[in-house]
Each structure stands twice: as structure tokens, then as C-alpha cells.
């Protein structure tokens, strides 16, 4: 009886472990997408998303990371975010007195975002892309303001760039609070420096609608 019970418990534990694996880096499994991201160092890392995920705390891409999140081809996975979007950071080279960009790529993913804030809580934006190259590769990105608040849909801060490639469709709407923008960028603490490119290629499209101030504001 004891052996049978132990075997049953082990089988149940194995089944739970298998079901709980949300993402993989190589053969290593993770129970959350954020855990998989946190495991990355400065070397390029590819994360395979195994399941659809629904997030209320957003995603944080730490300084210096180079992360690609793949969501499959035959059955693309969905990343749903409610309340908070994405916060990325770069690294500062004190000797060179310049920022080194981080890199974040979503590939074959569906992103469904309803947010007005980000995990860092700064920038008055749903997605704070700070000193980072953000690439959307064959991605469907649909984003709406959670409550029509005053912040922007995305803030490209300092040395940040946005690339839409391979048929990506990005739609941002509903940021119609006072002086709200779909995508916002300025030269805060980065005056007269090369930064903040938005490049759209390979039959991709960027649609920003129903915002108060400017759909895309670069000052």
C-alpha cells in the first residue's frame, strides 16, 4: 500500500511538473515566462513559450539582456497582459559615458495588452522601453488603454529602437487621456544623441488610433 501510494504521488508530481512548464530555454523548463527571462545573462538566449500566458504584473527585461521569445509557428502562443505592460533596461558604461542597449525580440507571438502602467511604475506609460532594441518578428500586437488614462502606450526612452518585421501587425489604441500618445519619445537626459528609430519592413504595419495628443510623438 505504501509503495503504491508513493508511486501514485510520484506520478502525480511528474504530471504536475509537466503541466506547469510554461517556457523552456534549451531543455531547461520554467514555470513562468518571467523566470525564464530572469535566467538569461548577457549572452543571447532563446525562450520557447510552451503555453498561453496571462499576466497581471507585466514583464521585466533586466539590464544587459539579449532575449528572444518564440511562440511557435503552427500554434502561436498568446501573451496576455492586464494592468501592466513591459519594462526593459539597458546598461550604462561609465568609462565610455554611454548606454549599451539591451535586446528583446518577440517571434511568432500574439500579444494582447490592456495596460496603462509598467512594472517599473515610471514614465507614465504602459511599456517603458529603455535603452533597448525591441523587435517584433511576425507578431500580432494588439494594445488598448485599460482605462483611457493619461499615459502613453509605449515610451521609447533614450537609446531605444522599435523594429517591425516579417508581416508584424501592431495596433495601439485608446490612450486618450490628457496629452496621451500612442508611442512617445523624447530626448530626456539624452539630448542630441542618435536614438529612437521606428522601422517597419517586410509588409508589416503600425496602426495607432484614438489617442489624445499625438499618435506618435517624438520631441
State where each predicted segment sits.
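Flexible, charged surface loops at secondary-structure boundaries
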Residues: 37-43, 61-63, 99, 129
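N-terminal extracellular ligand-recognition/capping segment immediately after the signal peptide
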Residues: 28-30, 44-67, 74-83, 111
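Bacterial N-terminal signal peptides that target proteins for export
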Residues: 1-8
Amino acid at each position: 500500500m505504501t509503495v503504491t501510494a508513493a508511486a501514485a504521488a510520484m506520478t502525480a508530481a511528474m504530471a504536475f511538473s509537466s503541466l506547469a512548464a510554461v517556457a523552456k530555454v534549451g531543455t531547461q523548463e520554467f514555470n513562468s515566462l518571467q523566470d525564464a527571462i530572469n535566467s538569461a545573462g548577457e549572452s543571447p538566449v532563446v525562450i520557447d513559450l510552451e503555453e498561453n500566458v496571462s499576466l497581471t504584473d507585466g514583464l521585466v527585461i533586466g539590464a544587459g539582456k539579449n532575449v528572444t521569445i518564440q511562440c511557435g509557428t503552427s500554434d502561436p502562443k498568446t501573451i496576455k497582459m492586464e494592468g501592466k505592460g513591459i519594462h526593459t533596461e539597458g546598461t550604462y558604461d561609465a568609462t565610455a559615458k554611454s548606454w549599451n542597449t539591451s535586446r528583446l525580440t518577440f517571434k511568432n507571438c500574439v500579444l494582447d495588452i490592456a495596460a496603462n502602467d509598467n512594472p517599473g511604475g515610471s514614465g507614465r506609460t504602459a511599456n517603458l522601453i529603455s535603452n533597448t532594441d525591441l523587435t517584433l518578428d511576425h507578431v500580432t500586437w494588439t494594445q488598448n488603454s485599460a482605462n483611457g488614462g493619461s499615459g502613453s502606450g509605449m515610451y521609447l526612452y533614450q537609446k531605444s529602437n522599435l523594429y517591425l518585421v516579417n508581416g508584424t501587425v501592431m495596433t495601439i489604441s485608446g490612450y486618450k487621456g490628457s496629452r496621451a500618445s500612442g508611442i512617445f519619445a523624447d530626448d530626456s537626459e539624452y539630448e542630441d544623441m542618435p536614438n529612437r528609430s521606428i522601422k517597419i519592413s517586410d509588409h508589416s504595419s503600425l496602426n495607432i488610433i484614438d489617442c489624445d495628443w499625438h499618435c506618435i510623438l517624438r520631441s
